[in-house]
């Protein structure tokens, strides 16, 4: 990936340019993904210098933590003590584990601004937990059941009916999502899972026929909608852009914009991708929230510049004025 290999910063410009702040993108490749999110990483690296930020990619697996009571940073990369960044953008996605969360917490404890914080990343990673919080706040979500083996098929049929969606608790880009059309399909599938992986963590989710093969993806930064698109499956019921689905811009109403802001507030997120399903009763139900959303499809479909929104949001957080930014970029005399 050229942008990552070259750090995406022109050497000559780096020598003369001053930066508003420095940042890390916490990222590791995920072999289980249909498509690696190299696009998003490259875009964040490419756009950083244009906004007077210096950003590099750090794999959390390369980080060593030193927890002590001394006033020392306690962060090492590949065994070397490093200067702390001013901010961190976590992009671990489904590869998030205890260690990467510990790295994020350590950075937070040392005063590094994290976009999002460890609590928000952990919440988003658990599909059931964030739906529980949203449901408790009165926001519309699909009916959801946590799987216990053996599965009570009578209960599922009574409370949800069929078809029913089966999901792993952790997964992105449509991976780990299956549709069981009837009771027999569900029983056969879950018996197979129980026999091969009895500790598997699964949820069952209400299937909304109005949303078969389509949903709405919204990307929000700071509680405001950057853009929204309707995703449409080419075949089957999964509408993910990364799996070859089509997309078109979607106009989001004021009422729905308020619900997005409420989701962001409840989950304490700075940036998120929110997936909404169509429902004839309430209009939309919140299906899932992602703390490190892909935005290749959104940029291509809606013509927005997502990294620009992210860095402008950081401008506000770090109280960097437009005049100060222009000086840093050499647009006006220093």
Sequence positions of predicted segments:
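Protein kinase-like catalytic core scaffold
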Residues: 164, 226-227, 272, 285-287
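ATP-binding N-terminal substructure of ATP-dependent carboxylate-amine bond-forming enzymes
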Residues: 1-115
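A long amphipathic alpha-helix within ATP-dependent nucleotide-binding catalytic cores
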Residues: 192, 237-286, 308-334
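A short, glycine/Asx- and small/polar-enriched loop/turn
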Residues: 70-71, 212-213, 280-285
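Active-site nucleotide/adenylate-binding loops and adjacent lid/helix of ATP-dependent enzymes
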Residues: 16-45, 82-83, 105-111, 115, ...
């Amino acid at each position: 990936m050229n942008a990552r290999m070259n750090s995406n910063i022109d050497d000559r410009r780096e020598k003369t340019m001053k930066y508003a702040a420095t940042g890390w993108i916490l990222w590791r490749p995920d072999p289980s993904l249909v498509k690696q999110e190299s696009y998003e990483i490259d875009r964040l690296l490419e756009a950083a210098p244009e906004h007077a930020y210096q950003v590099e990619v750090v794999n959390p697996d390369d980080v060593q933590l030193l927890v002590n009571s001394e006033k020392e940073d306690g962060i090492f990369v590949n065994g070397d003590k490093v200067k702390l960044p001013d901010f961190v953008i976590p992009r671990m996605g489904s590869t998030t584990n205890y260690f990467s969360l510990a790295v994020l917490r350590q950075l937070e404890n040392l005063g590094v601004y994290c976009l999002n914080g460890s609590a928000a990343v952990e919440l988003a990673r658990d599909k059931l937990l964030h739906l529980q919080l949203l449901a408790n706040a009165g926001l519309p979500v699909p009916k959801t059941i946590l799987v216990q083996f053996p599965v009570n098929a009578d209960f599922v049929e009574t409370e949800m009916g069929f078809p029913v969606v089966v999901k792993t608790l952790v997964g992105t880009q449509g991976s780990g999502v299956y549709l069981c059309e009837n009771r027999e399909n569900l029983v056969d599938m879950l018996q197979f899972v129980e026999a091969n992986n009895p500790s598997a963590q699964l949820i069952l989710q209400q299937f909304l026929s109005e949303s078969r093969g389509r949903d709405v993806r919204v990307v929000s930064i700071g509680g405001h909608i950057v853009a929204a698109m309707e995703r449409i499956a080419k075949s089957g019921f999964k509408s993910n852009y990364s799996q070859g689905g089509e997309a078109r811009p979607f106009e989001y109403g004021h009422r729905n914009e308020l619900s997005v802001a409420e989701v962001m507030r409840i989950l304490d997120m700075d940036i998120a991708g929110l997936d909404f399903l169509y429902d004839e009763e309430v209009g939309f139900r919140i299906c899932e929230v992602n703390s490190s959303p892909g935005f290749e499809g959104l940029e291509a479909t809606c013509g927005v510049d997502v990294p620009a929104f992210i860095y402008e949001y950081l401008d506000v957080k770090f109280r960097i004025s437009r005049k100060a930014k222009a000086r840093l970029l050499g647009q006006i005399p220093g």
